[in-house]
Swiss-Prot record:
Species annotation: Limosilactobacillus fermentum (strain NBRC 3956 / LMG 18251)
Residue ranges occupied by any Obg domain in the UniProt entry: 2-160
InterPro entries: G_OBG, GTP-bd, GTP-bd_Obg/CgtA, GTP-bd_prot_GTP1/OBG_C_sf, GTP1_OBG_dom, GTP1_OBG_dom_sf, OBG_GTPase, OCT_dom
Disulfide bonds: none
Protein name: GTPase Obg
Gene responsible for this protein: obg
């Protein structure tokens, strides 16, 4: 059986746009050919896509860094470079994506075929055909391609099931799942036999069906990570109905009620909204000798319990003899029909949603100074202009200088006290300031 992995961290690096080209027409009988440099192609994006054949994030354990290809550089004769292919990564249904740098939820992938662009490829740089003007009809100006986005993400799988089986270890959750769905979870007479969620489909004679998940057993402190803790609780979030199993064959009614409350306290500690889910209490192992006596007392204690908003419905079953199982499944199906489905936005399978990292309000540029006296310019807008400037051509350098001047960089440097001949650094590029 493959290892179940439901949480993983990955890096995604989109491709850079191709560089624009500086080129001129070289044709017979055209002595003064104009600019003919083409644009660079778009860089490849990183896209997550739901694949219903996947059940775990296991594939990411050994492949956590994903890089898309860069766009092709522009060519002469106004030819645009080819765009790079996008890199598509398959993920299981129910995957939530979080940006670890911002803490923001990037997207929730719940629909088959749903796509999410988690890192957008950079646009191609413009060739010199875009920079011709009456004053400069033959510009040696071209842009470098825009850098692709980089993100550090956490993928978290939350199983999509209509019904979740909850309860302390060894109350019979796996056995019930195997009886009603044909699933084959590991079953044994010791705690935490089930270490991963198991999923199966319940098919009723009337044609109705629903997905049921057997969750690993809860213990006190699970909401704080004790035992299987949070690994289990996240999978309950998407369920519509909870079947709360209590063992009345091997324990008396008072202990069963105490454990019933313990489980609900853990649910409330993790997320109070979970207690609003419809919950059916299922008394298990009713084929054992004292089970009926324990059940009668348990029902009395529930009815007398004033801590409950209302007395829950109680079903008694034996997974061994199958007594009461069909009645429980029919009631569960009815309850599912009355309960709203997990709230997820519908997505058009043909259109990918693109994640845009939130931009904090920041100045176009900032000025600081190194210990050696070099002035340092930084800032997202300024650095983007810099990396897209082709410094191999003097015209491009002059254009960048004009852009800095229009942004107010020159005036700000003078106000900060810069002197003629001082060194200025942008990233790894150093130049001399001239008044």
């Amino acid at each position: 059986m493959p290892t179940f992995v439901d949480q993983i961290k990955i890096e995604v690096h989109a491709g850079h746009g191709g560089n624009g080209m500086v080129a001129f027409r070289r044709e017979k009988y055209v002595p003064n050919g104009g600019p003919a440099g083409g644009d660079g192609g778009r860089g490849g994006s990183i896209i997550l896509k739901v694949d219903e054949g996947l059940r775990t994030l296991m594939d990411f354990r050994y492949h956590r860094i994903f890089k898309a290809k860069n766009g092709q550089n522009g060519m002469s004769k106004q030819m645009t470079g080819a765009a790079a292919d996008d890199t598509v990564i398959a993920v299981p249904q129910g995957t939530t994506v979080r940006d670890l740098d911002t803490g923001q939820i990037v997207g929730d992938l719940v629909e088959q075929g749903q796509e999410l662009v988690v890192a957008k490829g950079g646009r191609g740089g413009r060739g010199n055909i875009h920079f011709a003007s009456p004053k400069n009809p033959a510009p040696e100006i071209a842009e470098n391609g825009e850098p692709g986005e980089d993100h550090y993400l956490e993928l978290e799988l939350k199983m999509l099931a209509d019904v979740g089986l909850i309860g302390f270890p060894s109350v019979g959750k796996s056995t019930l799942l195997s009886v009603v769905t044909g699933a084959k979870p590991k079953i044994a007479a010791y705690e935490f036999t089930t270490l991963v969620p198991n999923l199966g489909m319940v098919m009723l004679p009337d044609g109705r069906d629903f997905a049921m998940a057997d969750m690993p057993g809860l213990i006190n402190g699970a909401s704080k990570g004790v035992g299987l803790g949070l690994q289990f609780l996240r999978h309950i979030e998407r369920t519509r109905v909870l079947l709360h199993l209590v063992d009345l064959g091997n324990q008396d009614a008072e202990l069963a009620l105490e454990k019933f409350h313990d489980i609900n306290k853990e649910l409330a500690s993790y997320d109070p909204e979970l207690l609003k889910r419809p919950q059916i209490v299922v008394a298990t192992k009713m084929d054992l000798p004292e089970a009926q006596e324990h059940l009668d007392e348990f029902k009395k204690l529930l009815e007398a319990d004033d801590t409950l908003p209302e007395t829950p419905q109680v079903f008694s079953i034996s997974a061994v003899t199958h007594a009461g199982v069909q009645e429980l499944m029919q009631t569960t199906a009815n309850l599912i029909e009355e309960t709203p489905a997990f709230d997820a936005n519908a997505h058009d399978e043909q259109e990918a949603v693109t994640y845009k990292a939130p931009q904090e309000a920041e100045p176009d540029f900032t000025i600081s100074r190194d210990d050696d006296g070099t002035w340092v310019l930084s800032g997202a807008k300024l650095e983007r202009l810099f990396v897209m400037t082709n410094l191999d051509h003097e015209d491009s350098q002059l254009r960048f200088a004009r852009q800095l001047r229009h942004m107010g960089v020159d005036d700000a440097l003078r106000e900060a006290g810069i002197q003629d001949g001082d060194l200025v650094r942008i990233e790894d590029f150093v130049f001399e300031f001239v008044q």
